[in-house]
Curated annotation (Swiss-Prot):
Pfam families: SET, zf-MYND. Its EC number is 2.1.1.-, 2.1.1.354. One of its GO terms (cellular component) is nucleus. This is N-lysine methyltransferase SMYD2. It comes from Sus scrofa (Pig).
Amino acid sequence: MRAEGDGGLERFCSPGKGRGLRALQPFQVGDLLFSCPAYAYVLTVNERGNHCEFCFARKEGLSKCGRCKQAFYCNVECQKEDWPMHKLECSPMVVFGENWNPSETVRLTARILAKQKIHPERTPSEKLLAVKEFESHLDKLDNEKRDLIQSDIAALHHFYSKHLEFPDSDSLVVLFAQVNCNGFTIEDEELSHLGSXIFPDVALMNHSCCPNVIVTYKGTLAEVRAVQEIHPGEEVFTSYIDLLYPTEDRNDRLRDSYFFTCECQECTTKDKDKAKVEIRKLNDPPKAEAIRDMVRYARNVIEEFRRAKHYKSPSELLEICELSQEKMSCVFEDSNVYMLHMMYQAMGVCLYMQDWEGALRYGQKIIQPYSKHYPLYSLNVASMWLKLGRLYMGLENKAAGERALRKAIAIMEVAHGKDHPYISEIKQEIESH
């Protein structure tokens, strides 16, 4: 495993957790523990033209594939390197036209199958954990999850049968189940979705809600850096989920996606839960039952909004955000994470509608509580400072813009490393204003 020492890490059996990763040497905050090239990856459809399909570089003036006119590259080298994967989709996209719509999971799984055929031996991404060793949790899948896998398998056959040989159906069920609980989403500095990938050695790490490392991306390379001091013999933990929410919500999410309940210090003590579900200070305080009902309402509206994003207009979405905040504010403080969730969604809609002032107003309300609820070095907090900084700059408030961007840089220097291209880009934004 590549590291800035001599390995300094080992795979071990973690009590009650199965396999895990353990430090053999000390790591300071900001140290790179290791990096892992993607075993297989795919750029999300919405980012085509903004990023190179092969190296994920973000730049103007990418060249498009002459055959399908859908894939974009830095140059001929990137295009040539990407061909073994792009050929799975190039002519099918032309043939199917508008009807070409495999999910990102299906696209990624097709690439894993192609990779296994091209490179059957162990790859540099699998120094400590091989793809074939991935946990699938097959025995824990309910009928709904099994049905989703079956429809993915059908889509795989439908869109990829011309260029791929498939294993038997049982093996495909296992592979999709493995991808579902070991896949990663690659995000940019504002946490916008760029694509999906498999990083086997990164998948070896177990989860904690107080993680001691953070995973970031440099193109299609995953990098793992310490966000707490790590001593020799200590297990290395990342977080699989968004840490904003209270313990019960986090564990519902972990059970649903990864089939375990977390027993980290945060989940055992529930130290942050009271502040996360902050109740409005009223002369006549809300009763326990009213609080319970409002939490239930909040969870439902979060789910309703998630579904509504796929078919409702921006103004309808904004209305859901505003009405739900109004209703919740009878019981919840503005710093309550359920309020923050809807503010964050509203900010996203404002950004989409290019209502910069509206987005800024929401961002200003979100940033302080975010800094309190999230761990010290958090990509969620960094990306919020970054969005705020860019909004201020765009609205000609240079002083506030620079302050916010520097806050983002301070977190990113630890999480992404001081030499990350994102940091040079942000410094450039400060200089050029």
